[in-house]
Regions:
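Active-site-proximal specificity loops/subdomain of glycosyltransferases
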Residues: 1-23, 37, 48
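Aromatic-acidic/polar surface patches that form glycan- and anion
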Residues: 3-4, 64-68, 76-79, 114-118, ...
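Catalytic core and acceptor-binding pocket of nucleotide-sugar-dependent glycosyltransferases
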Residues: 9, 82-274
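A generic fold-level signal
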Residues: 19, 26, 67-69, 120
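Residue-level detector of short, conserved catalytic/binding motifs and their immediate flanks
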Residues: 22, 72-73, 209
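Hydrophobic/aromatic beta-strand patches that form the interior of the parallel beta-sheet core
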Residues: 25-27, 53-54, 139, 209-211
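The conserved acidic donor/metal-binding loop of glycosyltransferases
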Residues: 28-32
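Conserved donor-nucleotide/metal-binding helix-loop-beta segment in metal-dependent transferases, i.e.
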Residues: 33-74, 79-80, 100
Length: 277
């Protein structure tokens, strides 16, 4: 398999190679972690024994029949027999199948907003959910936080989010302490009470967990023509530095300009508190 379908045999191989792992986490090469303190709510998915977690919305599947009703570029899949069997069904729509072209036609007939003719993994997954609603017993559509989020929507929020987190650190001295990466999870727990009013998802000022550069194709450079010039590249630089600042900040450094990866400045010991001490 090639292109986007190549993830399925890779995930299968990881399952077989690591039977001790309960979950396998697939993240596309064009997706970046942009909240370094976030912890996946795995207990939520264990409660009803969901086996596949993807970012998506039921109304876009069953009412609007959109091929963007979910994003198959980032998903959690439980390492179990159900998952192995499901991926086998899913992959039957892929290029190794003799019915590959037929599946492309079926997908376009159901999802009118699908722009290209070939069968793709995302449309295939949505089609299975659309035809078999009972699959939602095992497939969880995560829409409560940015399990992955569209970069065009997220990038403009970075500056406001940074300001909000700076205000939190000004108000709580223990969050300003420099600390080792090893104890970052505990500092995330210290910060959590301050984020209760931040909300989650699209209108939240909480850091987005994953910023997904859908359509940018960073490996091939063959990005969607709707993104002009250096839009994709500049966006990825900004996201990387936004995430990098969260790590550097622990050691007293920061990128003052998110579009400038080369410049790092030292912060005062009690930054962002300006004193007097």
């Amino acid at each position: 398999m090639n292109s986007y379908w190549a993830k399925l045999p890779v995930v299968k191989a990881a399952m077989l190679a690591h039977p001790e792992a309960e979950w396998i986490w697939w993240v596309d090469s064009d997706a970046m972690f942009t909240d370094m303190e976030f912890k996946l709510p795995l207990r939520r998915y264990d409660y009803k024994k969901h086996n596949l977690i993807v970012h998506g919305w039921e109304k876009l599947i069953y009412k609007k029949k959109s091929w963007t009703a979910l994003n198959a570029g980032v998903f959690l899949i439980r390492n179990c027999q159900w998952s192995m069997d499901f991926m086998e069904r899913w992959s039957r729509m892929g290029p190794m199948s003799s019915e590959y072209e037929k599946w492309g036609e079926i997908q376009r007939s159901v999802f009118k907003d699908k722009l290209f003719p070939g069968s793709d993994d995302q449309s295939g997954l949505i089609y299975l959910l659309y035809k078999e609603k009972s699959l939602t017993e095992k497939i969880y559509l995560e829409g409560e936080y940015y399990f992955e989020g569209y970069w065009v929507d997220i990038l403009p929020t970075y500056d406001n989010i940074t300001e909000k987190y700076t205000e939190i650190e000004k108000a709580d001295g223990k969050l300003r302490r420099r600390h080792a990466e090893k104890v970052s999870e505990q500092y995330g727990a210290f910060r959590e009470p301050h984020l209760r009013e931040a909300g989650i998802g699209k209108d939240s000022w909480r850091r987005p967990f994953i910023t997904h550069f859908t359509g940018c194709q960073p490996c091939s450079g063959d990005h969607n023509p709707m993104y002009v010039g250096e839009t994709c590249w500049n966006g990825m630089v900004k996201a990387l530095n936004f995430a990098d600042n969260q790590v550097l900040r622990k050691y007293g450094f920061v990128h003052p300009d998110l579009l400038d990866s080369n410049t790092v400045t030292e912060t005062s010991f009690d930054y962002p508190d300006d004193g007097p001490w």
